[in-house]
Regions:
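Catalytic cores of nucleotide-sugar-dependent glycosyltransferases that transfer UDP/GDP/TDP-activated
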Residues: 1-342
Length: 342
């Protein structure tokens, strides 16, 4: 039986944990900390000072640098990460959700570090992973793995299902929910809406202003609307109006938390068949996997085949906080076992 021990959960400091609106990594770190705490672990969450948690909160950065532009990102990150590692001896495990930066501290402490890789943001960061390839890693999908790293398993991201209730009924609008960026294919969602004759609601932060001005804003009208960033309540309001969620990435998806959130509410997802989408969406059951805009337009005509309850039941089975935390407990045990053999 796994012994509950002392765990430090290291969350990013771009946004509050959990985030008010955007912030997938912070969302997952929060769900891990809350889920572990509920299962009896002694958890300390390293996050911004305005974060909300039932675990012990340890903070040296008052607010996220994306929310308070007076906070210098590099200064905040180095103070935050170094603070966690200076307290490493107080924990049996550090669970990092911090990409490659925290890895550079991992050999300076005796406490084992497990890193959840939320995505390889660019080829330029790979030398860090290559140097620390003998560390402990978890992937968030089988598709998003790098060769040569020591993986303790794949643990799918889990959501708090109470935040995304099954909707009473759907609407007739297509919904895009994510960063306004070429990688997320906002322009493709617009094309699908135009060709299918359906209204489109676009929600999310504008991460690429030039892209928004050139490929999104000129198409905004009564049919295609940009509603800005949304919080959980805003997402649920969109899901209530949704015929389907369009997730037409132009690059391989690492996981796609919004796919799970939409399915939890009973919303079918039309997703580009790239990266993890095949793991998250059951083609023909919880949505449709497509190759291009033409495929997506055909899928819009078929969304009536998808049953809301089936979508939610799959999320309950595979993508709940409880399922995720159980997966991390197995990964923690694998780390502890490996450490015992050293």
């Amino acid at each position: 039986m796994l012994k509950r021990r002392r765990v430090a959960v290291l969350s990013p400091v771009a946004w509050r944990t959990p985030p008010r609106q955007y912030g997938a990594w912070e969302t997952v770190a929060s769900n891990v900390a809350e889920g572990l705490t509920a299962r009896g672990w002694d958890v300390t969450l390293f996050a911004t000072g305005d974060s909300v948690t039932r675990a012990t909160l340890h903070a040296v950065v008052p607010r996220g640098y994306e929310e308070d532009r007076s906070v210098d990102p590099k200064v905040a990150e180095y103070l935050h990460i170094s603070e966690a590692f200076e307290h490493a001896a107080e924990f049996d495990l550090i669970h990092s959700h911090y990409d490659f930066m925290a890895l550079t501290y991992s050999r300076l402490v005796r406490t084992p570090v497990l890193t959840t890789i939320h995505g390889f943001s660019s080829p330029q960061i790979m030398p860090v992973y290559e140097k620390y390839r003998d560390g402990y890693f978890v992937s968030i999908s089988d598709s998003d793995r790098a060769p040569g790293l020591r993986y303790m398993g794949t643990v799918y991201n889990g959501i708090d299902l109470s935040l995304y209730p099954l909707r009473a009924h759907g609407g007739g609008a297509l919904v895009f929910l994510g960063r306004i960026h070429p990688d997320k294919g906002t322009h493709l969602a617009i094309a699908v809406a135009q060709q299918s004759g359906r209204p489109l609601l676009i929600a999310g932060i504008i991460q690429d202003s030039e892209y928004f001005r050139e490929q999104v804003e000129p198409h905004l009208n009564a049919q295609i609307r940009y509603v800005g960033p949304v919080d959980v309540a805003g997402k649920n309001a969109l899901f209530a109006e949704a015929l389907a969620l369009l997730h037409l990435n132009t690059i391989p998806e690492r996981f796609g938390l919004v796919l799970v959130e939409a399915n939890a509410a009973g919303v079918p997802v039309i997703a580009m068949d790239l990266g993890s989408c095949r793991e998250v969406i059951a083609d023909g059951e919880t949505g449709f996997l497509v190759r291009d805009v033409a495929d997506a337009v055909e899928a819009v005509a078929r969304v009536g085949e998808i049953v809301d309850r089936v979508c939610r039941e799959r999320v309950e089975r595979l993508f709940s906080v409880e399922t995720m935390v159980a997966g991390y407990e197995r990964a923690y045990q694998a780390v502890f076992d490996a450490e015992d053999l050293r």
